[in-house]
Amino acid sequence: MKINNNQNIDFKTIKVNPIAGALGAQIDNIDLSENLPDEIISEIYDALLAYQVIFFRDQKFSPDTQKAFAERIGKPIVYPFVKSLENFPEITPILKKETDTNNFGGIWHSDTTYQEEPPMGTMLYGIETPDYGGDTEWSNQYMAYESLSEGMKKFLDTLEAVNISGKSRVAKTRSDIMKHASVGLKGDELKAIHPVVRLSLIHI
């Protein structure tokens, strides 16, 4: 069973260290806040497609440099329901207080599938994280699909799904983050129809 179609790339400018059998890799000794050569950016993108989730440790972003790096990977979007950083509509702060009880986005989901054109991935920058717990987890949907019977694949290939922003368990996990003074609900309920089987979203 293959993970995806790109797992045998010969990287020339970066060192990619796979961290799990199903997906994920870490790229070390690189400063993403710098104006990196196009060749490095291209290989970072290839690694993202190959491993679906990639990690970079010890990064120091300002909002400007975070946005600049994201723009070299793809086109940043504005998250429709939570207020963004001032002057940086594409960057959404996720703030947690000790009294917060909800886990923001804390069930299995693909980000913003209720949009007509969901983004190709999500970029997370951890500024202050707990010593343990608070994990973000991913699953390899290529592998999940490939493990199905041919009959089930053919059945799923014919289906479309209605994705609605306000009628899911994910929507309920937004409540705590909307309580903060710096964030809040905005916009109307969104809905989009997508094929059940499609290209997976990917994360940095």
Language model features: what each stretch is:
Residues 2-202:
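Non-heme Fe(II) oxygenase catalytic core, chiefly the N-lobe of the double-stranded beta-helix
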